[in-house]
Amino acid sequence: YGLFKLSELIGVSPLAYWCKVKPASQKEVVLTEDNMGVSREPSVKYRGFFINDEWPAFGNWCNRRFGGFTATMYEQVFELLLRLKGNYLWPAMWTSRFSVDGPGLDSAVLADEMGVIMGMSHHEPCLRHGEEYRYLRGKDSIYGDAWNFRTNEAGITRFWKDGLIRSGKFENVITVGMRGEADSAIMGEQATLADNINLLRDVLHTQNRLIKEHVNEDLDKVPRMLALYKEVEPFFYGDAETKGLKDSEELEGVTLMLCDDNFGNLRTLPTEEMRAHRGGYGMYYHFDYHG
């Protein structure tokens, strides 16, 4: 960050590559005591963005310039993120698989080398990409052929386990919880609030066990995140008849990512009582929304 600050002081924009903002040519650069400073620790630990709704513009550009969502492309994204003083990224996920398309783990290795902390989107738990299941599922697959924790618990659990074994060695914030395929509700309309809450409680219990077994026995040393997005928020709070996930031991130490309504309107804030939650809170805010 210090080097990028020097770069900023001599006139290099974070968007130098992306918007062709060419730095002005200077015969000499003079930095004085007025340019000196000590950066405080950021008040927000994980700061970043999510490459989403990436087709057609970003996807076509990646294919033309880099042959896909490769590590060569992500090097430019990582540098932009760091120049903006960020450190956390959710990669593109509509048709791509960050830990496969590098090729292989090249993008993940590069992120780790550059100090970028990787996450996956709110519906991609345990370091697995939504698109991966579409490619790997099948009647004879070890992962089964249904994105359904009730009917295919063994297959889904194996899918998550293998993701943690593959990518858990890097610096990540691990998404927990579960939503339906293609970013949809996890259960059908016939399911009750209690059905959904009980399912997620079982999912979280399994995911925490897998993380302890394959990443670190001390869960407090593994950053984890649950996004209270769309229908997940009422599962968190519950109602007068049904206890929600809010005080579940499975969420101890998990960062709770609060969400807007996709149009910039904040849906919820932690109460005074909730602020003591050990995992803290995050914010998932749509700068732009397509769909």
Stretches with model-predicted labels:
Residues Y1-N60, R64-L84, E181, T206-R209:
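Solvent-exposed alpha-helical segments and adjacent loops
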Residues K20-T32, G102-A108, D112-E113, D140-R278:
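Gly/Pro-rich turn-and-neighbor structural signature
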Residues R47-I51, L82, Y88-P91, M118-H122, ...:
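Hydrophobic faces of well-ordered beta-strands that scaffold small-molecule active sites
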Residues W55, W94-S96, H122-C126, G180-A182, ...:
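Active-site-proximal loop/turn and secondary-structure-junction residues that shape catalytic pockets
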Residues F58-N60, P91, R128-H129, A185-I186, ...:
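Short helix/loop capping segments that flank catalytic or ligand/cofactor-binding pockets
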Residues G68-R97, P103-D106, L110-S121, K169, ...:
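Catalytic domains of carbohydrate-active enzymes, especially glycoside hydrolases
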Residues E113-G138, I142-G144, N148-T151:
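Acidic/aromatic-lined carbohydrate-recognition and catalytic surfaces
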Residues A182-I186, G280-G291:
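Active-site clefts of carbohydrate-active enzymes
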